[in-house]
Swiss-Prot record:
Chain intervals with Polar residues compositional bias: 64-74
Assembly information from the UniProt record: Heterooligomer composed of large and small subunits.
Free-text function comment from the UniProt entry: Bidirectionally degrades single-stranded DNA into large acid-insoluble oligonucleotides, which are then degraded further into small acid-soluble oligonucleotides.
Name of the protein in question: Exodeoxyribonuclease 7 small subunit
InterPro entries reported in the protein's UniProt record: Exonuc_VII_S (IPR003761), Exonuc_VII_ssu_sf (IPR037004)
One Pfam family from the record: Exonuc_VII_S
Compositional bias of kind Acidic residues: 79-90
PANTHER family membership: EXODEOXYRIBONUCLEASE 7 SMALL SUBUNIT
Keywords associated with the record: Cytoplasm, Exonuclease, Hydrolase, Nuclease
Enzyme class: hydrolase
Domain of life: Bacteria
Segments for region (Disordered): 62-90
Length: 90
């Protein structure tokens, strides 16, 4: 992510946290709560997209390093069972 996107991500995340706090307080009129919910959903969607993009970039980088991450969050060959599974698949 670029510095500009990092800053926007942080701002959107901070705003989302503010919105969640306001909604959890329960002290808002219905209309205000609905507006905040919609704004929060937009912030959450943006943050999720940026996180997905960053994860994809890391996966591409790791593939280039011949050390891809598995879905369990560890690298191939990190655990002894990995080598046995790879041999069975071959």
């Amino acid at each position: 992510m670029s510095a500009k996107n990092d800053n926007l991500f942080e701002k959107k995340l901070a705003r989302l946290q503010e919105i969640v706090g306001a909604l959890e307080s329960g002290d808002l009129p219905l209309e205000k709560g609905m507006a905040l919910y919609k704004e929060g959903a937009t912030c959450a969607r943006y943050c999720r997209q940026q996180l997905d993009k960053a994860r994809h970039e890391l996966e591409i980088w790791q593939d280039g390093q011949a050390n891809p991450m598995s879905s369990q969050g560890h690298t191939a060959g990190e655990y002894p069972d990995d080598e046995a599974e790879e041999a069975e698949e071959a």
